[in-house]
UniProtKB/Swiss-Prot annotation:
Region of interest (Disordered), ranges: 52-101
Keyword Mitochondrion appears in the UniProt entry: yes
The name this protein goes by in its record: Protein FERTILITY RESTORER RF2, mitochondrial
Top-level taxon of origin: Eukaryota
Gene Ontology biological process: chloroplast organization; thylakoid membrane organization
Localization annotation: Mitochondrion
UniProt entry tagged with the keyword Manganese: no
Transit sequence range: 1-52
GO cellular component entries: chloroplast; mitochondrion
Length: 152
């Protein structure tokens, strides 16, 4: 569907308007096909005529899309969260490792990392206590040596 529109200004402006359908919606576009003048017209008048044609547009109505929600369980039964059954292993959810694993008795290689960390912390604690005892012995030995020197 196309229409021709003419405008009576000092010159004639012919626009070509067409309606297009896209996805169930209609859009109307207009293009200036030719501009002809019989005499000289100022640029201001030409811009006004183009501006007049540009502001005369039609609003297009768009159909809104609707979505239907289908239940995953047609019987209406919903499943609750999986609970821990009390057996050994990690909690049901661990960050970065995915879900589920609470009742399975743990996962071998992941347990080794925790054991290694605990062993390192235990070793550092032992070294800290050992250093405190060593410093205390040196202070006592130095204190006794100083007392012996003063008494002689």
């Amino acid at each position: 569907m196309s229409t021709l529109v003419t405008c009576s200004l000092p010159g004639a402006v012919t626009t070509h308007a067409s309606t297009r359908r896209f996805g169930g919606s209609q859009f109307q576009t207009s293009q200036a096909s030719c501009i002809s003048f019989k005499r000289e017209v100022s640029a201001k008048a030409v811009l006004r005529s183009v501006r007049c044609n540009a502001t005369q547009t039609q609003s297009a109505q768009r159909k809104s899309s609707t979505a239907t929600v289908k239940r995953s369980d047609p019987k209406g039964k919903t499943q609750g969260p999986k609970l821990d059954d009390g057996s050994g292993g990690f909690p049901p959810f661990r960050f970065g490792k995915g879900g589920g694993g609470g009742g399975g008795g743990g996962g071998g290689s992941n347990y080794f990392g925790g054991f290694l960390l605990f062993t390192c912390v235990l070793l550092l604690d032992y070294l800290k206590e050992f250093e405190k005892n060593l410093i205390a012995r040196r202070q006592r030995a130095g204190y006794d040596a100083n007392n012996d020197m003063f008494q002689q």
